[in-house]
Regions:
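Short acidic linear motifs
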Residues: 1-389
């Protein structure tokens, strides 16, 4: 038997699952995404993206406000593809999304164009930052909400890669929202809009993983139904030997562990955003950031204060005129907020950006004099920090 006590074929099991997922087309955001999947222009954004978006400029435009005159090529690129943004906003107005499941092992990953959805996420991020710089905060928050809703839509199909891509898309929106709340002019109206967004703060990983495994079994079962009992035994034997020889290359649990880490890191950002909104309200009312999270704990549901990566508290630390907020990661060791890029396990929620380097245009006489005395490498002019009280 494929499953003890379950004699249904893969197609019968799939039909039962899809019956529980069925919704009217007018409620299904997947219909709108599919229209974009079938548009060659919408699925080739990376080919037409401005060449100026190289290296650090890409992240700068994705996470910081910019004006059209600063990046005219990018502004024209956004305007040319505004119809994609409009279609994504239309999809984001729907809560339900039903990308189909399948028993065809060759088609599992072809129902969703992951690469295009990632490119659309970048497009939304670029456009939102242009909106912020030019005073269109309502448009910016709509685009950030759209990023979160895209992730919410993807997670409604129990496929591991859908969850991983969802995390990546939502992370763009969450990181940008955190910066907006902390370091920019976020009003109470903006904070309420953000709180109303589909923030992924609830832990449903156990239920999600159960559904993912069930859907994951279907294509394999369908394939093995066409084999003789001997061929099925051979498949299991060779799969076991290959997995052992390659150190778990095909080990499903390894992929699940990575997906779980991504899921909980995204959740940590979402919970961190809720905490930061409470911190910002305290700063607006009192005039400075709290000395500890005890001052705002009563304003938040208890689960929001829990770090999902280790089920302990987040680290909140006041600095000079600012603060740091981060997870100590699965190892529960406080490594001062340093993340994977620095060889550590911490997961930063908000670490104030480093001061800008000194001007090199030679127009600052005081800085030039200091350089002459001490040498340029020792001179740093601190940048005004909007995170300060």
């Amino acid at each position: 038997l494929w499953r003890l006590g379950d004699r249904r074929s893969a197609d019968e099991r799939l039909a039962d699952i899809e019956a529980t997922r069925n919704i009217p087309d007018v409620q299904d955001a997947a219909i709108l995404y599919r229209e974009l999947f079938q548009d060659p222009r919408a699925t080739s954004l990376s080919d037409s993206r401005p060449e100026s978006l190289n290296g650090s400029v890409f992240n700068q435009r994705l996470y910081e406000p910019w004006r059209s005159e600063e990046a005219p090529e990018l502004a024209r690129f956004i305007e040319k593809h505004r119809y994609i943004i409009d279609k994504l906003l239309e999809a984001s107005a729907l809560d339900e999304c039903r990308f189909p499941l399948t028993t065809d092992i060759t088609a599992v990953l072809s129902e969703v164009d992951y690469a295009s959805m990632r490119q659309w996420a970048f497009l939304l991020g670029f456009a939102a930052n242009n909106d912020v710089a030019e005073g269109r905060l309502g448009d910016a928050t709509a685009r950030w909400r759209c990023l979160l809703q895209m992730g919410h839509h993807l997670r409604q199909r129990p496929v591991l890669l859908d969850f991983i891509v969802a995390d990546g898309i939502q992370t763009i929106g969450l990181k940008r929202l955190i910066r907006f709340v902390v370091a920019e002019e976020s009003t109470e109206t903006n904070l309420k809009r953000i709180e109303a967004m589909p923030l992924p703060t609830a832990d449903a990983w156990t239920e999600n993983l159960r559904d993912i495994r069930m859907a994951d079994d279907l294509p394999v079962q369908k394939m093995m139904e066409q084999w003789s009992p001997t061929e099925r035994l051979k498949y299991r034997f060779y799969a076991y030997r290959f997995n052992k020889a390659t150190g778990g290359l095909l080990n499903k649990s390894t992929s699940e562990d990575k997906a779980a880490q991504s899921y909980f890191r995204t959740m940590a950002l979402a919970r961190g955003l809720r905490i930061i909104i409470a911190l910002k309200r305290h700063r607006t009312e009192i005039g400075h950031w709290p000395e500890s999270m005890d001052e705002i704990a009563a304003l938040l549901p208890e689960p929001i204060l829990m770090d999902p990566l280790n089920e302990g508290p987040f680290v909140y630390r006041r600095t000079i005129g600012a603060f740091e907020l981060y997870s100590t990661g699965a190892n529960k060791i406080d490594e001062q907020g340093r993340g994977e890029s620095e060889g550590s396990d911490d997961w930063p929620i908000w670490i104030p950006p480093a001061p800008a380097p000194p001007s090199r245009n030679g127009q600052d006489p005081i800085m030039n004099e200091l350089k002459a005395i001490y040498g340029e490498r020792y001179i740093t002019r601190p940048r005004a920090d909007a995170n300060a009280p």
